[in-house]
Amino acid sequence: MTNKTVLHAKHLASGAKMVDFFGWDMPINYGSQIEEHHAVRTDAGMFDVSHMTIVDVQGADAKAFLRRLVINDVAKLATPGKALYTGMLNEEGGVIDDLIIYFFSDTDYRLVVNSATRVKDLAWMTKQSTGFDITITERPEFGMLAVQGPEAKAKVAKLLTAEQIEAVEGMKPFFGVQVGDLFIATTGYTGEDGYEIIVPNNSAEDFWQKLLDEGVVPCGLGARDTLRLEAGMNLYGLDMDETVSPLAANMAWTISWEPTDRDFIGRDVLTAQKAAGDQPKLVGLVLEAKGVLRSHQVVVTEFGNGEITSGTFSPTLGHSVALARVPRSVKVGDTIEVEMRKKLIKVQVTKPSFVRNGKKVF
């Protein structure tokens, strides 16, 4: 039985091509993935992300529990609504999932985790909650939309009440606010400005339709993938999984090593890996010649082989880009090779980010 989001009928009405995405019937595109991609880079596009898992963690020990559960430190979060990106690790230091945590108070947090990892995430959190005075509550009564692009905020504002407009006015990145029926957050997965909006299921279709009426372009999973890859954002299951350390997945910046007495799950393993300095790293690859870089292609370097984790043709740049896990000695600016159709093709090593706010950043 395939799951359907609350917006499923809207996708069909817009002529979406639907695919099975980890048990969810989701739109891959509405006709042209490239046009949808460009809409987000130049104007405004919207995505149904209601398949994502929303989990509220509440109770006297909520803060202590999350300080143990994830590699970033929720103690940093002092302003209600502030959010952070982090990873949840197993005891071996592998990434169970990446997620966003919103802080409401020391006893009230909201987590947004991936849909493909929902069952194992909830099981892991429940297992780790033993001894903590908390409740873990999934929130399936909400849908979620991402409205992204340089004109996204202005177009969303046309749908908001005066109170909601005032609440989000000047809101910095990685903040969220509950105002009226909507939870509006300045987060996203595209490298563009915009909002992710959590909306009650019973008003999700109406909200989607009003955005359509404002000229916001519906976008599918195809454009979502090319946009996130241009922005250098990881996709769980490709760029990292339970066998991969955050140190090897461009997630080291999300690890809060201080204070040293915070015993987060996987800390001992990461500390040893950091000291050894032998973890591979995630870099960007650029191929300006013909050809498309793809996941699992072998990367050949003088320090040993690596592997492309995510690769695609970049509609914004007009050539192929990829994320690849390579030996740590490989440096930005190096020329290395990728095996393509039994040939070795030269590629340039860059930082793992290619486009932000519509502009090339490498």
From Swiss-Prot:
Its EC number is 2.1.2.10. It comes from the Bacteria. Coiled coil: none annotated. GO terms for molecular function: aminomethyltransferase activity; transaminase activity. GO terms for biological process: glycine decarboxylation via glycine cleavage system. It catalyses: N(6)-[(R)-S(8)-aminomethyldihydrolipoyl]-L-lysyl-[protein] + (6S)-5,6,7,8-tetrahydrofolate = N(6)-[(R)-dihydrolipoyl]-L-lysyl-[protein] + (6R)-5,10-methylene-5,6,7,8-tetrahydrofolate + NH4(+). One of its GO terms (cellular component) is glycine cleavage complex. Pfam families: GCV_T, GCV_T_C. PANTHER family: AMINOMETHYLTRANSFERASE, AMINOMETHYLTRANSFERASE, MITOCHONDRIAL. The glycine cleavage system is composed of four proteins: P, T, L and H. The glycine cleavage system catalyzes the degradation of glycine. This is Aminomethyltransferase. It comes from Colwellia psychrerythraea (strain 34H / ATCC BAA-681). The lineage of its organism: Bacteria, Pseudomonadati, Pseudomonadota, Gammaproteobacteria, Alteromonadales.
